[in-house]
């Protein structure tokens, strides 16, 4: 059964107040959340990746966007937020709901949602500390285009089990790259 959009919206509205009161503890909270998300994503695999080798695809992960040395902290947090938001959107679709074991999908979505809350709290806090623009628009656009390519691939492959397996592996890869960005952020603190 698809995740109820109205339920997700209710959770979003109810937790919005708490976002503003949270402090930014990104290095610990996001790193742990990212590890939990990776574990859940690994558990979601239903078919052997080896049976889907013919479906592999290069989605053009914008690796340079995960090189935190080129960003200020607020911009790096914004890139992380966009990546998690796009992942959440991808796995909140009806097609995604049909592809994965429901309890694992719900846990994964909940983990992503919590990471979004943490990142939003950090953006709110960091914007007050820095006079730089909130986002590096080119970086955000690169992340969005990356996810558009993933969505187009799924559509072209008619959301087949192998297509979802390839996407699952790709999202694990992108979450791993975001871990590198988090390490750089920790050094900047």
From Swiss-Prot:
UniProt subcellular location: Secreted
Example of a GO biological process term: adaptive immune response
GO molecular function, one term: cytokine activity
Main location: secreted
Database matches in Gene3D superfamilies: 1.20.1250.10
Disulfide bonds: 24-122, 52-162
Keyword Signal: yes
Alphabetized UniProt keyword annotations: Antiviral defense, Cytokine, Disulfide bond, Secreted, Signal
Top-level taxon of the source organism: Eukaryota
PANTHER family xref list: INTERFERON ALPHA-10-RELATED (PTHR11691:SF66), TYPE I INTERFERON (PTHR11691)
Family listed: Belongs to the alpha/beta interferon family.
Name of this chain's protein: Interferon alpha-17
């Amino acid at each position: 059964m698809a995740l109820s959009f109205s339920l997700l919206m209710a959770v979003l509205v109810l937790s919005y107040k708490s976002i503003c009161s949270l402090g930014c503890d990104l290095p610990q909270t996001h790193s742990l959340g990212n590890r939990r998300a990776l574990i859940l994503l690994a558990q979601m695999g239903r078919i052997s990746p080896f049976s889907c080798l013919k479906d592999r695809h290069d989605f053009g992960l914008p690796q340079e966007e995960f090189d935190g040395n080129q960003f200020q902290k607020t911009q790096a947090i914004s890139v992380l937020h966009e990546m998690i938001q796009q992942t959440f959107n991808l796995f909140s679709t009806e097609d995604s709901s049909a592809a994965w074991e429901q309890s694992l999908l719900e846990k994964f979505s909940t983990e992503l949602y919590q990471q979004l809350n943490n990142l939003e709290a950090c953006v709110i806090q960091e914007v007050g500390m820095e006079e730089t623009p909130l986002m590096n628009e080119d970086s955000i656009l690169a992340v969005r285009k990356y996810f558009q390519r993933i969505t187009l691939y799924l559509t072209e492959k008619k959301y087949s089990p192998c297509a979802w397996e390839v996407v699952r592996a790709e999202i694990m890869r992108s979450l791993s790259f975001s871990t590198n960005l988090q390490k750089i952020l920790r050094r900047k603190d």
